[in-house]
Amino acid sequence: FELRDYQKEAVDGLYNYWAGKAGDNPLIVAPTGSGKTAIIAQIIKDAMSYPGTRVLVVTHVKELLEQGANGLLALYPEADFGIYSAGLGQKVLDRPITFAGIQSVWERAFDIVPAPDLVLIDEAHLLPKNTETRYNRFIADLKTCNPMVKVVGLTATPYRLDSGYLHKGNGAIFDGIAHDIPVAMLMEQGYLSPVISKGGLNQIDLTNVKKRGGEFVESDLATAASDPELVRKTVEEIVDLSADRKSWLVFSSGVNHAYMLKDEFETHDIDVGVVTGSDSSAVREKTIADFKSGELKCLINVNVLTTGFDHPAVDSISLCRATASCGLYIQMIGRGTRVAEGKTDCLVLDFGANVERHGFIDQVKPKDKSAGSSEGEAPVRQCEVCQTMCHAACKICPECGFEFPAPLLNHSSSSYRGAMLSS
């Protein structure tokens, strides 16, 4: 297989990081849809050129393990690998390459003989901040077995969903960023779908929604989002603005809210499904399969499809929830950035002021708590005529031609091709 230029740069960036002795355990930041599987496959193939090398690929759910193993096999058919996952019914630890679920393997570090030389952690943003986690204990045990082991994290966002950077703070597993693939470049070169954004005319009132641990309290958010009139108007707006789009993905503010949205969509004769964390695997997989096949036009999810969900045809995303997590924000938007035949862009309808809160997807950064408590303003403004999200410096709306009055700092609801990029 042959890497794209930016994928090769990511792999080279890793080796340069090690050569420059910047550290042993870096992150590679690869936006959703950039071909992370190919990057992982190349790193593994390079490692296998050194006889006796052992590579371990670790992630948190069996679906990602299957995707990773199948992806490696497709790109590198001669790879000699095994899978260690209770969920997949396989427990093989004696191959040069092992794909393992952290829940299954975290207490088995001393059983991996010889010890791994390289550990690749997929979806690294899901690592908790707490240092007493399965990942930390597992890696500490691996280092006992092989003090020279290197650990590389791959992620679309170099920060956790609930806190700051993965390579900063006490007990951080990672020590830096080896390479960060720019999302704007991928969109400009056609490797990712452009994303356009409209701020919903009907926003969730967050006045009485408290924060806990840096995120909105789920019960408060669910209550605020579940106002019947707000639900009715929100769905009406989604149906209107997504009318010419094929595959709609909706992020809700809770299970009850999801089913309220579903009932409302059905009054518009929209074929819609709901997936939640409490669904059985069989039910969830069937609903997702129906969505991917086109049997369902709309899929509403409750904290389920924010990572590892791959359906390139998604061309409409509705954020019917608010999040203070820039990582979660990027992961949600990322569900629509993959390219697909007949897809020109992905529309993001924001009903939770998330774009205002976090800004453009190529400039999102977690808040630096040490710099003070002020959250500041994201550099976006919304056209009051068509609701397009524009850069704060725009004087004329690129969608409808509305001339902005004196400088504004916030946003409104129509869209243009570059609405979610800073330039």
Where are these regions (language model features)?
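Conserved interdomain linker/interface between the two RecA-like ATPase lobes of SF2 helicase motors
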Residues: 175-252
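Post-DEXD/H (motif II) to motif III coupling segment of the RecA-like Helicase ATP-binding lobe
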Residues: 129-197
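Conserved helix/coil segment N-terminal to the catalytic DExD/H
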Residues: 87-118, 129
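Walker A/P-loop
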Residues: 21-43, 251, 275
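Conserved pre-motif I regulatory segment
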Residues: 1-29
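Conserved helicase ATPase core of P-loop NTP-dependent helicases/translocases
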Residues: 83-93, 259-263, 270-302
